[in-house]
A protein has these predicted regions:
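Acidic, polar-rich low-complexity tracts and alpha-helical solenoid repeat scaffolds
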Residues: 1-275
Length: 275
């Protein structure tokens, strides 16, 4: 129904500002829902060529890059963002370019761009914290580890790019391969956490629980415990078992950033039991 409405708008007023936005909305449906990347790409490009709104121009540019990534065409995505950034000096485009370099398996280039960004932005900039977190992430899992570990991290990035291409089964297979061939203890918890999330999406809950159990003693211990509780609560319908996991956060991980949200969630569960 939505598709027919947008198509009629495009037919009746092809050069109007309304048509520009309608094309963008239709492209969103093709990209996010229908997953027809070729049609979405054509619509985003058409909308971009008509738009006068800076906001809509930016949205189209970022989406065109996303669609190229979804198609696995990193080169086109990077070239397009590079040329767009030379015309539109917009931070969001540069940040998207950093993302594309990272997921195309070029963390060194992404890190160089991040470090260059810190030369021109101040701590109050709205992107400062995000860039800082990304820099720390790359430093921890790539810069500070050996050559073998660096290759493992690049394979992890490839699995992330597969997810962005909607290839969830292939991403899971790649992560499983990494686990079976990886001896780097630093990156192992990251791989297990990411694979557990994918296994939940694939409704393989027992396998996900097995992955989450390996996170004990790692920097992701609290997340593993919480996610295990969520599996029992949301998918197995076992709130009593879920409470056991949630109480471990309260008792053993009181300093966790998740402790207060878990306290609040526990109160909700107990209130629901009273009803």
């Amino acid at each position: 129904y939505s598709l027919s409405i947008y198509d009629s708008v495009l037919t009746s007023i092809p050069e109007s500002a309304i048509a520009c936005e309608a094309e963008f909305r239709l492209a969103e449906i093709q990209y996010r829902v229908m997953e027809d990347f070729d049609k979405a790409l054509n619509l985003y490009k058409s909308s971009l060529s008509k738009c006068r709104s800076k906001t809509l121009k930016e949205q189209n540019i970022l989406r065109i890059a996303d669609v190229h990534l979804a198609k696995g065409d990193f080169i086109s995505s990077i070239k397009f963002l590079d040329s767009s950034y030379s015309i539109h000096d917009i931070p969001e485009i540069k940040n998207k370019l950093i993302e594309m370099y990272l997921f195309s398996g070029l963390p060194d280039t992404a890190l160089t761009m991040i470090n260059n960004s810190f030369k021109t932005i101040i701590p109050t900039n709205k992107y400062f914290n995000d860039l800082m977190e990304l820099r720390d992430f790359i430093n921890h899992y790539y810069v500070k580890i050996d050559a073998e570990g660096k290759e493992v991290f690049k394979n992890y990035l490839r699995s992330e790019s597969l997810l962005k291409q909607r290839k969830i089964f292939e991403a899971n297979q790649l992560l499983e391969y990494i686990q079976n061939n990886n001896n780097n203890e630093i990156i192992s918890p990251l791989i297990s956490l990411r694979r557990s999330i994918i296994l939940i999406r694939l409704k393989k809950y027992n396998e996900a629980l097995s992955q989450l159990s390996t996170l004990n003693g790692s920097i992701y211990s609290d997340r593993g415990i919480i996610m295990s509780g969520q599996i029992y609560e949301q998918f197995y319908g076992d709130p009593s078992k879920a409470l056991e996991y949630y109480m471990r956060i309260i008792n053993d991980y009181s300093d966790s950033i998740f402790s207060e949200p878990i306290r609040y969630h526990l109160r909700k569960i107990k209130n629901n039991e009273k009803i």
